[in-house]
Amino acid sequence: MIQLRQLSDVIVKDKVVLLRLDLNIPQEGGKITDNTRIVRTIPTIKYLILHGAKVVIISHLGNPKGRIELTLSLRSVVTELEALLNIKVQFCPESIGATPKNAIINMKAGEVLLLENLRFNSGEELNDATFINELGSSGDIYVNDAFSCSHRKHASICGLPTKLPSAAGFLLLSELKHLTSIFSNANKPFTVIIGGAKMSTKLDLLNSLITKADYLIVAGAMANIFLAMKRFNIGASLYKPELINVASLILKKATSTNCKIILPFDAVIQNFNSNNITILELNSSLVMQSNAKIMDIGPQTIAQIINIIKISKTVVWNGPVGAFEQTPFDYGSTYLSKAIAEKTRTGSLCSIAGGGDTISAIKKSGVIDDFSYISTGGGAFLEWLQGKTLPGVEALMQKFRYS
């Protein structure tokens, strides 16, 4: 098991604790639509409050690319934090400079201050030394409880541990413990479902999982690459032509292992001119109109995947299989969520899901509590699946080794 300094290893009373969370949560019209990542960090915040720390929360929201965008202000999460913690949460409209320094100086033990979006400053994503020094100058201790950001080499993830005594929060430790245990002892048949729209990073994942999984189920925009490679007419469906050669190599590699790659047999198609919705079989004779897109997997595909789930002992899921935010394109993700949850409840399946959209899709299906483990990580979850060491975790490990 990875060795990291824990909260119980540091004295936080009357100390300024810079607590890195992932508050990059889905919102619509300024309203939070899924608070999972906040809820999972509450035990760490409450521990620090109870032990008399001055808790300074730092995070990012969206990708403003070093510019101030009011629609991406972290002020929007203050009310949710206050409701979950049942205390007043102060907000500072800046992350570095005199304003946050003064706000921190005036804090009392047990109080919570949220700084503005770190990515309003370009130094965050550049892991800039000046930004790191400025951000860390008011802190006594650094705590990382943002597993879902720990794959990024950013200032608040990799830089601050080089400047301050550092520890891992409860959520980060929980993620590492559960994921390490699950993937080192995965019972077979081992099935992986990969969907969503982030194609290039997930192709790397598919390539690494071919030697580990018994079934690789590919859906969403990921599947479109393979369908295009087979020269199927997929209309205006999202895919990246430059990735077709990589997909071809993955299929060839899979033939030399016992891994079966499962692609959709049929799909739900929407014509964006007429809004007409049809279900079509995906084959070489398919002719889709240029203004039509694949929006979800079809009933034959759903049935086949459910049959695979029924014989599986471990299922890992990352990425919705359709545009689940819209009805009726949520059927695929909903049926799979319920099938996985049903078998998990019997005790005969270990089910793990990760990624913001995946969590939202499962939550929408009403069965999120029935999964064995829900990871808050998206990109971090993918990199961990590939066996990579996360930069944020490595930074904490280095601090533990040499402190």
From Swiss-Prot:
Superkingdom of the source species: Bacteria
Subcellular location: Cytoplasm
Residue runs in coiled coils: none
Pathway membership, UniProt: Carbohydrate degradation; glycolysis; pyruvate from D-glyceraldehyde 3-phosphate: step 2/5
EC annotation from Swiss-Prot or TrEMBL: 2.7.2.3
GO biological process, one term: gluconeogenesis
UniProt binding sites for ATP: K202, E325, G355, G356, D357, T358
Single Gene Ontology MF annotation: ADP binding
Family, similarity comment: Belongs to the phosphoglycerate kinase family.
UniProt cross-references to PANTHER family, sorted A to Z: PHOSPHOGLYCERATE KINASE (PTHR11406), PHOSPHOGLYCERATE KINASE 1, CHLOROPLASTIC-RELATED (PTHR11406:SF23)
Protein name: Phosphoglycerate kinase
Organism: Orientia tsutsugamushi (strain Boryong)
Underlying gene: pgk
